[in-house]
């Protein structure tokens, strides 16, 4: 079957540049496992990159600079390339990136094949030669039928740039993890203010402010290296983005590699927020680029909340909440019907020891103690609590005459 195929593209990889990017690959290999290997761009300057998802709202792009030593096109000549295949094929444990970024690799090549009579490649074959000049590996898989437009995401120009320090990055990662553990909304709002030079991150009612040091320059061509101390920025306009909390947390972890790079926020003119791994000045220049594109997330709407400034809505909601509270309290404690002092229901039967039944009046609410709504004052001040002895005398004086006037005794023996 392999003999019947026609070679369309054949490329020899620059092994040294792939080895130089091995540290970045090992840092993000868990994300790249389910990603796509892409060869895009012009045929004169092809780009090798691996694209994967960063949680639910981010796109991770790992690019290798100067990836090929030679690039030949036999059939299907096109002005632009768009070749994609899975890093881990279906039903297999083989990983292309593991072989291509290996430290013991001496030579590697990729060959794209097509069926006779067709004008597009259908399969890709990788050939890897190890340092011992004996061990070789070869693997063939089919191409994907579609190619995501990953090269079109960075279409806009960089309008603002924010470079974080090690201390600030650690603080933000810890704060986002705390908000995630609290079960807060999964949406984070990033607000960038030009006048105050601050970056505000808010999750629900919690917020965190990062004070930045503004510098002069063009955001697209300045701040090309990260600094371990201090948070610097170039802001041309105010920005506000709603992104996924998990994706932002993953982007900060992906773009922070010890002794190599720190996260940098790039705000593009087309509304795209990009987190880039910006390399240190003192570190050896790597032959790769690492970035995470954060997609816009719709903030969770609280339908029970009340927008600020809408007084009528606030009043209606307050009345509704009061009525709901009253209905709940009434369902738990049903209202009692008022009892008249002269009605037979106000007498209680108290069984006596000698077999007689005593009838006494309920004195819990007397006529003198009841007040009509007109008699109640507008605001009653709490009176001082009387002493225990005076309270007993007053209660004893009230109960004395009433108990004498209502002595009703019935002896069934007589």
Curated annotation (Swiss-Prot):
The organism's place on the tree of life at top rank: Viruses
Q: What keywords does the record list, in alphabetical order? A: DNA replication
Q: Where is the composition biased (Basic residues)?
A: 389-405
Question: Which segments carry the region annotation Disordered?
Answer: 327-414
Q: Output the GO biological process annotations, alphabetical, semicolon-separated.
A: DNA replication
Spell out the family assignment given in the record's similarity comment: Belongs to the herpesviridae DNA polymerase accessory subunit family.
Question: What does this gene product do?
Answer: Increases the processivity of the viral polymerase, probably by acting as a sliding clamp that prevents dissociation of the polymerase from the active template.
Q: What is this protein called?
A: DNA polymerase processivity factor
